[in-house]
UniProtKB/Swiss-Prot annotation:
Transmembrane segments: none annotated. It comes from Mycoplasmopsis pulmonis (strain UAB CTIP). The record marks 9 as: Discriminates between blocked and unblocked aminoacyl-tRNA. It comes from the Bacteria. Disulfide bonds: none annotated. This is Peptidyl-tRNA hydrolase. The active site is at 19 (proton acceptor). NCBIfam families: pth. Gene3D superfamilies: Peptidyl-tRNA hydrolase. Its EC number is 3.1.1.29. InterPro entries: Pept_tRNA_hydro, Pept_tRNA_hydro_CS, Pept_tRNA_hydro_sf. PANTHER family: PEPTIDYL-TRNA HYDROLASE.
């Protein structure tokens, strides 16, 4: 069983914000599969296919580890079969990169997952939102995506959804081979 988790915050006030890019990728995957995240359990919502789960925690970003821990254990999913998707301020707007393992680099949702699963060996896809120049990170990431960035994010979300469908129906090696994402092992 494969588990793909998009991180974000629940609620209309967070919809279409930089911090909810993980949610947007999951929504795009569901759209391409013509499925709905119709199960609600473990304080999250998900769709369970034959060999995969696509999901969004409803715990708020900083407590995402609780959902990932519970769904992983309930469905007996190996850590090696989990991919987490989230926003990253240290990447340029629209740039995406994959990280096989390592620290959360200050991303609190990922930190929560690392703490709950007791390992840094968790695959993740980071979507760049750039670091703000003149405002606190916390307010910047929770603002709606501005018009001049919407097309860039729509494109990267669509591309990531296609690449993650490759993972769902194949394996991680195939995903890496078809992906043009930067592979970072740090």
């Amino acid at each position: 069983m494969k588990l793909i988790v998009g991180l974000g915050n629940p609620g209309d006030e967070y919809d279409k914000t930089r911090h909810n890019l993980g949610f947007m990728v999951i929504d795009k995957i569901a759209e391409k599969l013509n499925v709905k995240l119709d199960k609600e359990k473990f304080n999250g919502i998900f769709y369970k296919g034959e060999n995969y789960i696509i999901s969004k925690p409803l715990t708020y970003m900083n407590n995402s580890g609780n959902f990932v821990y519970d769904i992983k254990n309930f469905f007996d999913i190996e850590i090696d079969n989990i991919i987490i998707i989230y926003d990253e301020i240290d990447l340029k707007v629209g740039q995406a990169s994959i990280k096989i393992k390592g620290s959360a680099n200050g991303q609190r949702g990922m930190q929560s997952i690392i703490e709950k699963l007791k390992t840094e060996n968790i695959k993740r896809i980071k979507i760049g939102v750039s670091r703000p120049l003149y405002e606190p990170v916390s307010s910047y990431i929770l603002k709606k995506i501005p018009e001049n960035e919407k097309e860039t994010f729509e494109k990267v979300i669509d591309e990531l959804a296609d690449k993650l469908l490759t993972y769902i129906f194949n394996d991680f090696k195939t995903f890496i081979n078809v992906s043009k994402l930067k592979n970072s092992k740090k």
